[in-house]
Every structure is written in structure tokens, then in C-alpha cells.
Amino acid sequence: MPTATAPARRRRLAGALACVWLSVTAPACVAEALRMADEVLVVKSERRLYLLHDGQAFKSYKVLLGLNPLGPKEREGDFRTPEGHYLLDGRNAASDFFLSLHVSYPNGQDVARAQRRRWSPGGSIMIHGLPNLPRRALKYYQTSDWTDGCIALTNDDMLEVWLLTRPNTPLEIRQ
């Protein structure tokens, strides 16, 4: 009998985890789901992600950032988390980091800034969970800025953000 591929196993695991999580938290989740986020705000200096509805935060999560978190992302490989206005323009249920939401980085300002210096602005910025195949102890991923520039949450928090956002939800990232 052939064995399942790694992406297929990850999808099944993500689905099973989602079912377990929903069965445990369904009443609270249903109440919160009535209030979907119409905007997401990340405040880097606070290490917080806020889900907003009509301009009011209704959920807040601890986040970890790129290895070089101070200042806006300027170029590919600088390990910084961008700052500015973006969209959550893609969803990946088969991510290497549990689940991921794609950030529409770079925007026009990011591209112009990088071009002035003849740099590549980089890309592939995500909001995501923890690595499916961690290389370090779990505590590292929960206490240290560790990404290449992405915004990381615990898997439980990532699942909530996934469920409470829609495609193309506006995202603001500020210092």
C-alpha cells in the first residue's frame, strides 16, 4: 500500500487538528465568528496582532517577528518584518508552518524604496503558525523572534486568525 506524501499528511493533520479545536472551542468560536475581522493590525513594538471589526479590536494575539525586527523591511534577506498597508491575499492550508496567510508585500512604496537603492524588495511574507518540522525546541519558537521576516503565532492562535479573516482582509503593520 503506498504511503501518503508529506503535503497530504500535513493537510490531513491540519484538518484533524481543526476538527478537534472546533469541538473544544465551538461555542466561543461561533460567538466570535459572528464578528469576522474586517482589518488586521500588527504592532511590532508590542509583538501583538489585533483583529478589528468596525475599527475596534475584538481579539489580540502574541506574535513573533523576523530575526531583525527593528525598522521596516528594505530588501530581500534582511530578516525584517515589513511596515505599511497590505492585504491578506492568499491562504495556504498545506504550509510548512501549520497554516499561512500571504501578505501582499511588497506594495508600491516598498518597491520604489528598494528600486532607489537597486535592491530586490523580497517577498513571500506570511502570517503563519509554528514549523511542522521544527529544528529547535518549541520554547525557542514561542519566545524569540525567529522568522525570515514573517509574522508567527502559535498554531492555536493561527487557526483562530485563519477562521476569523476572509481573503483580501486589509492588514496594517506598524512599528
Stretches found by the model and what they are:
Residues 1-8:
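N-terminal secretory signal peptides that target proteins for export/translocation
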Residues 9-18:
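N-terminal export leaders
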Residues 25-27:
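N-terminal signal peptide c-region/cleavage motif recognized by signal peptidases
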Residues 30-79, 83-85:
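N-terminal secretory signal peptides
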